[in-house]
Amino acid sequence: MEKLTDLNYTLSVITLMNNTLHTILEDPGMAYFPYIASVLTVLFALHKASIPTMKIALKTSKCSYKVVKYCIVTIFNTLLKLAGYKEQITTKDEIEKQMDRVVKEMRRQLEMIDKLTTREIEQVELLKRIYDKLTVQTTGEIDMTKEINQKNVRTLEEWESGKNPYEPREVTAAM
């Protein structure tokens, strides 16, 4: 690990890359040299930047796995951005956070739907009571005795002797 952060080693790797690129460049059919050179430069820079960072992170952090995972994800996301991709790699922690946020929002919406449903049910019950009060209720026979002030009127069947007491009778007078 000491060798990776050594300046002489870095210079020898750069020299090796340059020699390799010059041998590739001598081939006249090599048209993609600038692209290969830029990719190799980026990879080497990431390699040189990530090794000391990872060493320090592993020594100082207690949760080294999370730090290493975060560094690797960050490196890959940087490479994807350099390649022109808009997608990014996410870790399980980020996915779990997003899922928790989605679940929380769904619970909030379900509570809102429950409240609205309860209100709608109450409104329907109120409208039913109002409708029941406004509907005309039919009864078999209407008692009109209170309206025409004839409470003591009897029918033919209700009279005791079976005769109408209001019919005129023959009256004989004694002299």
Curated annotation (Swiss-Prot):
* SUPFAM superfamilies hit by this protein: Rotavirus nonstructural proteins
Localisation per UniProt entry: Host rough endoplasmic reticulum membrane; Host membrane, Host caveola; Secreted
For Ca(2+), which residues are the binding ones? E120, Q123
Q: Does the keyword Cytoplasm apply?
A: no
Glycosylation positions in this chain: N8, N18
Query: Could you name the Gene Ontology cellular component terms for this entry?
Result: extracellular region; host caveola; host cell rough endoplasmic reticulum membrane; membrane
Checking Pfam families in the record gives: Rota_NSP4
What membrane topology is annotated for this entry? Single-pass type III membrane protein
Q: Where are the transmembrane segments?
A: 29-51
Which ranges does the record list as Lumenal topological domains?
Answer: 1-28
What molecular function does GO assign, one term? channel activity
Superkingdom to which the source organism belongs:
Viruses
Protein task: Plays an essential role in the virus replication cycle by acting as a viroporin. Creates a pore in the host endoplasmic reticulum and as a consequence releases Ca(2+) in the cytoplasm of infected cell. In turn, high levels of cytoplasmic calcium trigger membrane trafficking and transport of viral ER-associated proteins to viroplasms, sites of viral genome replication and immature particle assembly. The secreted form acts as an enterotoxin that causes phospholipase C-dependent elevation of the intracellular calcium concentration in host intestinal mucosa cells. Increased concentration of intracellular calcium disrupts the cytoskeleton and the tight junctions, raising the paracellular permeability. Potentiates chloride ion secretion through a calcium ion-dependent signaling pathway, inducing age-dependent diarrhea.
Written domain comment of the UniProt record = Binds 1 calcium ion per tetramer.
Assembly description: Homotetramer. Interacts with the immature particle in the viroplasm. Interacts with host CAV1, early and late in infection. Interacts with host integrin ITGA1/ITGB1 heterodimer. Interacts with host integrin ITGA2/ITGB1 heterodimer. Interaction with microtubules blocks trafficking to the Golgi apparatus.
Q: Which HAMAP family match?
A: ROTA_NSP4
The family annotation for this protein states:
Belongs to the rotavirus NSP4 family.
Protein name as catalogued: Non-structural glycoprotein 4
